[in-house]
Regions:
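Bacterial N-terminal signal peptides
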Residues: 10-20
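Bacterial Sec-dependent N-terminal signal peptides
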Residues: 19-46
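N-terminal zymogen propeptides
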Residues: 43-74
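N-terminal catalytic cores of secreted or lumenal carbohydrate-active enzymes
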Residues: 63-246, 266, 272, 276
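Charge-rich, low-complexity intrinsically disordered segments
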Residues: 234, 257-260
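Short, conserved phosphate-binding/catalytic loop or strand-edge motifs used
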Residues: 251-257
Length: 277
């Protein structure tokens, strides 16, 4: 997409960050003590072993603790890998979590002081882990309140995305939580990826261009590549107006997964011309 200097990044996998709301007598009213360990530190495994935790579907084992021997010669390849710390190749820019409607909904059920303490522990570079990335969806995802895009109804022929509008998931939950996180870590990099394009942009196949009125599967209609690119830019600009700067976008979440709750099949042969649009 030839718009400003926004980077397009392809992510093979994403980590979903969800905070589970637990029912208890004090629920979300009491502050969370993040400093006092609940148990004594685990003992260091015996030299040459690794600690294991096993859970089986039949319930016989549930986080059963054990040890596994390392480098005992059994089933080991005859090749030795040596690490040279002086040789450096690609670098890792950072690590992060997905910020979804469900996680933000649960966070907003918490006492504000407890929520602030939790977010500081995760995102603060001085008082916490210093998590440097957050991923949000461009439209709905697995953890949204429902299926939607930001332009479910096609606009005019001259401006097909004239009906673009953020959904309540973003306005009432994701954006407020992102602002809280950014107040803790202003250098946080936010990336976005769509699960699906608007349904009116979908076709069953790119040759016949038969319409595909479905949240799952389907292809991006080649006729709408430029329109969909403008949809991305519109999202970036609208989020900026709301105080959220998008660092990078990915063309498609799980591009080969046709069966997700919302999905768009986008193999590289179709993704490449879209990125160039």
């Amino acid at each position: 997409m030839k718009y400003h200097n926004h980077k397009i990044m392809m992510f093979i996998c994403a980590t979903a960050f969800s905070v589970t709301a637990c029912s208890s007598s004090n629920s979300f009213s009491d502050p969370i003590d993040f400093e006092t360990p609940s148990e004594a530190p685990n003992p260091i495994p015996t030299q040459g072993t690794a600690k294991t935790f096993t859970t089986t579907a039949d319930g016989i084992y549930s986080l059963a603790e054990g040890e596994a021997k390392l480098f005992d010669g059994v089933s080991m390849a005859p090749t030795t890998i040596e690490i040279d710390k002086n040789k450096k190749f690609q670098t890792i820019d950072g690590f992060g979590y997905a910020i979804t409607y469900s996680s933000c909904y649960n966070l907003m059920q918490m006492n504000p002081e407890a929520r602030q303490a939790l977010l500081k522990r995760i995102y603060s570079t001085t008082e916490g882990y210093g998590v440097s990335y957050a991923r949000i969806s461009l439209g709905c995802n697995d953890f949204s309140s429902t299926e939607y895009t930001y332009c479910d109804k096609k606009g005019s022929e001259n401006d097909p995305i004239s009906n673009f509008e953020l959904y309540s998931d973003e306005n009432n939950y994701v954006i407020p939580i992102l602002k809280e996180i950014l107040s803790i870590n202003p250098s946080l990099k936010i990336i976005a990826a769509p699960w699906t394009c608007p349904k009116w942009m979908k076709v069953a196949d790119i040759d016949t261009k038969t319409p595909k009125d479905s949240w799952t599967d389907g292809h991006l209609n080649p006729d709408y590549r430029e329109t969909y690119a403008k949809y991305f830019v519109k999202f970036i600009n609208v989020m900026k107006e709301k105080g959220i700067n998008i660092y990078a976008v990915s063309p498609q979440n799980e591009p080969l997964n046709k069966a997700n709750c919302a999905s768009l099949y986008m193999p590289w042969q179709e993704e490449a011309p879209f990125v160039k649009a």
